[in-house]
């Protein structure tokens, strides 16, 4: 069940951000990929997944996941595209 939820969020975010799932799971620093990965991490955290589980799924450190979560609202204020990706991902997930 856990893996299916991660995959559903990953696929929904991939579709909303127009970034491949493989790119989101990579170490890419491209802004589009970072935005998509950040949205997926935020949604998973809101769903109750702990940073250590999210980190394992994305092959990141727990510290990098916490950093993403701690800075998400600040990035959201200055990045309207990030807000749109978040909204669209939530819509896609709500329709599943």
Model-derived features: where do they sit?
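Basic, alpha-helical nucleic-acid-binding regions used in initiation and control of genome expression
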Residues: 1-96
